[in-house]
């Protein structure tokens, strides 16, 4: 599944594929969210391509299958951290990291609550989760985001846009880019 300009998502059961010069993300989504076919995942991956550099430290909030954090590493990020409240998601993300050649030296995963488990600051924070979770967590994200970092949020159905934008704004974020696909939204945000 080609995504953006640089990535090709290859479900592990697909034997025949041509990378076409793209970074290949080998993925077994299991029961965790993030197979690469959903609009929100594609929107996030396309946004990540713009911001990942060799110095990027990335945080994946609600990491699911690990698709966003593993893709960030494939795009050249220095390190990635994933956190999810679902232990199965964390296990799946770890397996997908290993499947793509990333061990604990570059890819760290935590099971539990964002604020209980994570410390430090990141250049890119991505959260492809439901609107209610974005609204709830956005007040916490600022302390994990570098001042010049980017907060990529998706999982937002268009009918919830105003509510999410208001929450982001009240938490000190401004939307620098709005992307839409099939009624789903992704915002690229910076600190105000």
Where on the chain are the PLM-derived regions?
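Non-catalytic substrate-recognition/targeting regions of SAM-dependent transferases
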Residues: 1-34
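Structural motif
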Residues: 6-8, 23-25, 57, 79, ...
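S-adenosylmethionine
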Residues: 79, 85-191
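Structural signal for conserved beta-strand scaffold positions within catalytic alpha/beta enzyme cores
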Residues: 9-11, 26, 60, 111, ...
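Generic structural signal for well-ordered alpha-helical scaffold segments
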Residues: 14, 45-49, 142
């Amino acid at each position: 599944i080609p995504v953006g300009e640089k990535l090709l998502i290859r479900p592990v059961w697909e034997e025949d594929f041509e990378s076409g010069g793209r970074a290949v993300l080998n993925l077994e989504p299991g029961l965790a969210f993030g197979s690469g076919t959903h609009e929100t995942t594609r929107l996030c991956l396309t946004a990540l391509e713009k911001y990942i550099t060799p110095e990027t430290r990335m945080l994946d909030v609600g990491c699911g299958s690990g698709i966003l954090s593993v893709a960030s590493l494939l795009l050249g990020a220095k390190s990635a951290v994933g956190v999810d409240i679902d232990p199965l998601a964390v296990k799946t993300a770890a397996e997908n990291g290993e499947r793509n050649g990333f061990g604990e030296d570059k890819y760290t995963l935590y099971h539990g609550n964002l604020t209980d488990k994570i410390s430090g600051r990141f250049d890119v924070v991505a959260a492809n989760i439901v609107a209610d979770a974005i609204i709830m967590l956005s007040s916490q994200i600022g302390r994990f985001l570098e001042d010049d970092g980017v907060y990529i949020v998706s999982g937002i159905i268009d009918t919830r846009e105003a509510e999410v934008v208001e929450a982001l704004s009240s938490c000190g974020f401004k939307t620098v880019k709005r992307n839409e696909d099939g009624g789903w939204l992704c915002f690229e945000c910076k600190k105000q």
